Amino acid sequence: MRKIKFFDTTLRDGEQSAGVNLNLQEKLEIARQLERLQVDIIEAGFPASSKGDFEAVKQIAETVRTCSVTGLSRSVRSDIDAAWEALKGGAEPRLHLFIATSPIHMVHKLRMTPEQVIEAAVEAVKYAKRFFPIVQWSAEDACRSELPFLAKIVTEVIKAGASVINIPDTVGYITPKEYGEIFLYLRNNVPNIENISLSAHCHDDLGMAVINSLSAIEHGATQVECTINGIGERAGNAALEEIAVALHIRKDYYQVETRLNLQEIKRTSNLVSKLTGMVVPPNKAVVGKNAFAHESGIHQDGVLKEKTTYEIISPELVGVSSNSMVLGKHSGRHALRNRVEELGYTLSEEEINQLFVRFKELADKKKDVTDDDLIALIFEEKFDHFKDFYQLSSIQVQYGTNQIPTAVVVLKDGKGNTIQEAATGAGSVEALYNTLERCFQTAVTLLDYRIESVGGGRDALAQVFVKVRVNDVETSGRGTAQDVLEASAKAYINAMNRMFMIEAMRAENEKVTTP
């Protein structure tokens, strides 16, 4: 049975989603979880693009041991050199080279002739092979390329040493039948193609990324590039979880196998959703909240009698467990640590101690602390602290049906200075955000504001997600608290702290690149 490799590009292509800005710690946590999921390859970033990306790729390569870590590179020596410096400490360093091959890209973007593009691609592969044992080569915009030219350049880069050939549907333009035919054409017209791996990379602009990827597998691809939850530029990329479960459930049809640990899918999906701020739609296949919900009476009756009447995927297959433990105010540190580990999270001793304090505070306010509550606290403790920037000290909001809503906010900056401001607004949240804007002394555009409950009940935690824009930079933030307004303030501050982190990284990059 053929084996299909999963190439996860959540940390590179996925992070290019509008408003997604992951810090180093968040990228490392996602990489560790992808390793638990047992993807074959993690594309950790684009090392030559910035100092921050370089450092993230380097640390991920040095941390992950059971997956191959790769980085993206243009067909230029300086990019390849940067990628090698970042990836050489990995367990199995590999490089992902690309150059555009469609007429529109060659003429308008590269301004190169087809012969010059072939020469650049071959030279880059040969140079990369001096360092990397595995070189993957991608034909950017392959699906709008002329097939004879595509076959010609693929032939030449294979001769130069490329061992993986990736055929991206860069703009999400192709149909399943056409995409499969490209793979058949290459298999029939490229010498020695049986000695290399063919890879698929699909975007979802026309809603066909997953089915196109499956078509590629049917027509000879042995690797698929995808992202968790299908995040990515524009309409996103092919969703890893959908391809993986389709191959598993329909193994009778596809006749392939993977090394993925499918029980880690739901946990991975939740992690990526929380850290990116991109909420998974309830009706999302495989990982959506409603994926295993049956509302129709006929369906409910059938499932109660025999699950397989209407449930082709068992929740347990992807790690959705009904085994939820409830902790309370009498639960100790040992019980907390055990449950954290059972939920699949790794925390340091210091993080456990800090989490225990927050857990006790919540347990005093709530009768029961559920797994959802605990996960929310873990995220807040592990990822939402930016000690060098701003932290919330207190908020006070005054509201009445016949009064003008007013907010008072007290913040502390990284140097311990106290900042206090007050402002009004049309509603409580607007008053709060107007006050915070005064605290930061920066014009901020609020692009999105979403709130959801963590678990059920009147005492449930509130989780708020925001997306903001300052000048040309968009970023997201999240906040958790029992009070909606406190959660709203935390989310806004979290987004602004990320903004200041991005600005600091930009300033550092300018120092590095300035002669």
Curated annotation (Swiss-Prot):
Binding, Mn(2+): 13, 201, 203, 237
Listed SUPFAM superfamilies: 2-isopropylmalate synthase LeuA, allosteric (dimerisation) domain (SSF110921), Aldolase (SSF51569)
UniProt keyword list: Amino-acid biosynthesis, Branched-chain amino acid biosynthesis, Cytoplasm, Leucine biosynthesis, Manganese, Metal-binding, Transferase
GO BP terms in the entry: L-leucine biosynthetic process
InterPro entries per the UniProt record, alphabetical: 2-IPM_HCS-like (IPR050073), 2-isopropylmalate_synth_dimer (IPR013709), AIPM/Hcit_synth_CS (IPR002034), Aldolase_TIM (IPR013785), LeuA/HCS_post-cat (IPR054691), LeuA_allosteric_dom_sf (IPR036230), LeuA_bact_synth (IPR005671), PYR_CT (IPR000891)
Family that this chain belongs to: Belongs to the alpha-IPM synthase/homocitrate synthase family. LeuA type 1 subfamily.
Subunit structure and binding partners: Homodimer.
Protein name: 2-isopropylmalate synthase
Lineage, top ranks: Bacteria, Bacillati, Bacillota, Bacilli, Bacillales
Gene name of the record: leuA
